[in-house]
Amino acid sequence: MQAANPRRGYILGLSAYIIWGLFPLYFKAIANVPAVEIIIHRVLWSALFGALLLMVWKHPGWWRELRENPRRLAILALSGTLIAANWLTYVWSVNNGRMLEASLGYYINPLVNVLLGMLILGERLRRMQWIAVGLAAVGVAQQVWQVGSLPWVSLVLALTFGFYGLIRKQAPVKALPGLVVETWMLVPIAIAWLLFNPTAHSAQLEFWTTSEAWWLVAAGPVTLVPLVCFNAAARHLPYTTLGFLQYLAPTLVLLQAVLLFGEHLSSSTLVAFIFIWAGLAVYSVDAWISLRRRS
């Protein structure tokens, strides 16, 4: 990995996570469009802009490798379905006043990844990792006890993204070509949805004279730009550094939920966040100690 320019890496990494953290502002701008329809257009425009970007930003041999390995294509079809489910849940949560739950979901995602590694890949957890996962579990259990139901938005976001990452590891394709293939595999479903929903907002000609239409078209660049920034940052920074930066996005979502959109941060929700933050602190310290020992 090239790490010759850490300053550039930090700028690119921060840019990626800040854009991801500010996604709620974008989705609020098209809140009148149903979440499913937003995702349909996110798939279509990401596929189009991604294909154009691949023509400019060359990735030699990626399509030949996929064509010669149908198993990887099948894996990308499955991972594409998972990321679409993740996108749908996130957009729905933002536009239905559940941003705090969305933030919680992305906070617990690293700990869910650790748990999936143990349960599915047979990885052995270190003592501090057990403590981190346990603290997060207490936070979720506390929410169930106080609210009387599972924080399903948080769990769906964390699990779909966790399984997405797990499955994508089975198809070693670079991020941009992988995302382009994932979205193109969903394009037939997206087109079929539009054909069978003639009353949809974007199926009306007059809709395309509104500003919301341009916001929908922007779904392609909005999806791809932070991904490109992240991939570029990964060439200049250690992956563990990017791991620490990832907490910026859910923090921005949390701040927007409370300060901009008036979501109520109850004492019980705050307690859940505190347990999960404590778990993340333990997880981060453990990752730092492990890195020091390896080096």
Outline where the language-model segments fall.
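Glycine-/small-residue-enriched transmembrane alpha-helix faces in small-molecule transporters
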Residues: M1-E37, A141-Q170, A192, S295
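C-terminal-most transmembrane helix of multi-pass membrane proteins
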Residues: V43, Y247-S295
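C-terminal transmembrane-helix exit sites in multi-pass transporters
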Residues: W92, N109-Q129, T251-L270
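Membrane-interface interhelical linkers
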Residues: M1-S15, L48-L76, R127, L179, ...
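Helix-helix packing/entry segments at the starts of transmembrane helices
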Residues: L104-I108, V173-M185, L224-L259
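Hydrophobic alpha-helical transmembrane segments of multi-pass membrane transport proteins
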Residues: I18-L22, Y26, A77-V94, V156-I167, ...
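Hydrophobic transmembrane alpha-helices of multi-pass small-molecule transport proteins
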Residues: G50, M128-V144, L157, S268-A287
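Juxtamembrane helix-loop-helix junctions in multi-pass membrane proteins
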Residues: G21-A47, E101, F163-P188, S202
